[in-house]
Amino acid sequence: METKQALVLLYNGVVVTMDQECHVIRDGAVAISGDRIKAIGPTSQILADFSTVADESIDLNGRFIMPGFVNTHVHTSQQLGKGIADDVDLMTWLHKRIWPYESHMTEEDSYLSTLLCGIELIRSGTTCFAEAGGQHVPGMVKAVEQLGIRACLTQSTMDCGDGLPPNWKYTTDECIQSQKELYDKYNNTADGRIRIWFGLRQIMNATDQLLFKTRDIAQELNTGIHMHIAEIPYENELVVSKKGVDHGTVTYLEKIGLLRSNLLAAHSVWLNDAEIGYFASGGVKVSHCPASAMRLLGFAPIKEYLEAGVCVSLGTDGAPSNNRMSMVDEMYLASLINKGREMYISGATNPTVVPAETVLKMATINGAKTVLWDNEIGSLEVGKKADVIIVNPFTWSMVPLHDSISNLVYCMRTENIESVMCNGKWVMKDRKIVNLNEEEIVQSAMKQASNLLERAGVNLPNRMKFV
C-alpha cells in the first residue's frame, strides 16, 4: 500500500524561483508533497487548490521563499582547524598547518568536524554542498545523514608530491580503488542525498596516471571530479617546466582531455584567455571562492568566465582559509570583489560587473549545475526537490525593501534566514537546528579541536601579550 505523502503549504510569501526566466511571485505560495514541489503560484490559487487537503499550512507574512544555496567548494573536515592558518602564505598554510592537521585526523574527528560545519552551512541557507576533499569520507557520510542536507562527497586524493605526511603515501591504484569502494558503498545513500565524486587535490600531487584513471573512471560511473586548479602562479610555472606546455595547469588538462562537463574546477584564478576558452568549450564548471581567494590566491577572472559562457558558482572553501562558512557572506563578497577587480585591471570603475541577480544565480541554479544536480535542485519548479529556505527581510539589516533582489545579496545576513528545508524535511525551523543538539556539538568540537591540534604538533604564534 502506497504511503500518503505529507502536503505542506508555504503561502503569502515572495517566491524567488530562480527558474530559467527568473520569475518572482510577489504574493506567492509553494505546495510541497513529500520531498518534491507539487505546485507554485499565486497564494489565492494555491490555497484554493490545496488548503482543504494540506497537512500543514504556514503563513509567511511576506517573507521570501527561495531555493536553498549550493556551496560548491567546502572542506568540512577542516572545520576543527578554524583559525589555525590565518595571515600566512599558501605553502606555509599547506605544509606547516593544514597537512599536519589533516593527517592526524581520525574518522571521529571528521564526523564531528562535518557536523560543526554543517550547522554553519544550514544557518546560512545551504542545502547542498560539494566536499572539496578530506581523509575520512565515512565520517562525513555519517554526519551528512544526520544533518539532513545534500552533499557530493570527495576523498582528498594524492599519489605524489613533496612533503606529504608518511600516512598519505598511496599508489595510483590505491587512490583509485579506495574511491571506487566509497562510490560503491555510499553513492546515492541517505534517501538519495549523498553522491560520491572523485577527487584530485591538485596537479602538483597527481601523476599522469592518476589524472588519466580518474578521468576515465568518473566518466564510466557518470560522476564528477572535484579539483583545485590554477590557484597560484607557482603552480602554473611548475606545470610549464615539467609538462612542456606554454602556460600552465589548464593548458595541460586540455591537452590530456580532462576538461569535461563533469569537472568542478575550484578557484581557477590564474588562467589566460585561451584557457578560459578551453573551460567554455569543455563545459567545465568553476567554483569561485571570493573570501579565500582574497586571502591566499588573487583575483579570479569571473567577468571573463561569465562573458565566455562558463558556469560559475560559489563556494566558501574551508574554515582555515575563510573562517566563515556562509554563502550569504560569499554572495556579498563575490559582487564587491569583482567590481574592485575591474577597477584594478582597467583603471576605470564599472559597478555593473557581476550584479545582484547574477550572484543569486551563482549561489543557486549555477551551483546545482556545477554539482550536476540541476535536474532536481537549484530552483523552485514543479517536480524538483523541496530544498527551500525562508528569509525574513523585516529586520534592521534589510529594511527598507526598495529593491528586494538587490537586498538579498547586499543586505541579507545569516540571521535573516529563519527556516531551511531539504528533501521536503525541515533541517532548521524558526532558527532552531532540527536534527542535532547544537550546544552539545559545539562543546564537543571545542574539546576535540584542542586535542587534534596537540596531536598534530601545530603551534600558533602569540599575536599579543596574553596574561
What are these regions (language model features)?
Residues 255-262, 303-395, 411:
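His/Asp/Glu-enriched, well-ordered alpha-helical/loop segment
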Residues 140-270, 274:
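Metal-coordinating catalytic core of metallo-dependent amide/deamination hydrolases
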Residues 130-134, 197-213, 294, 370-373:
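Active-site glycine- and acidic-residue-rich loops that bind
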Residues 13, 30, 35, 62, ...:
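Divalent metal-coordination and catalytic microenvironments
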Residues 1-28, 32-38, 43, 48-50, ...:
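Active-site microenvironment of metallo-dependent hydrolases
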Residues 82-149, 175-191, 446-454:
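Alpha-helical scaffold segments that flank or form the walls of functional sites
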Residues 80-112, 155-173, 232-262, 333-354:
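Active-site gating loops and adjacent loop-to-helix segments of metal-dependent hydrolytic enzymes
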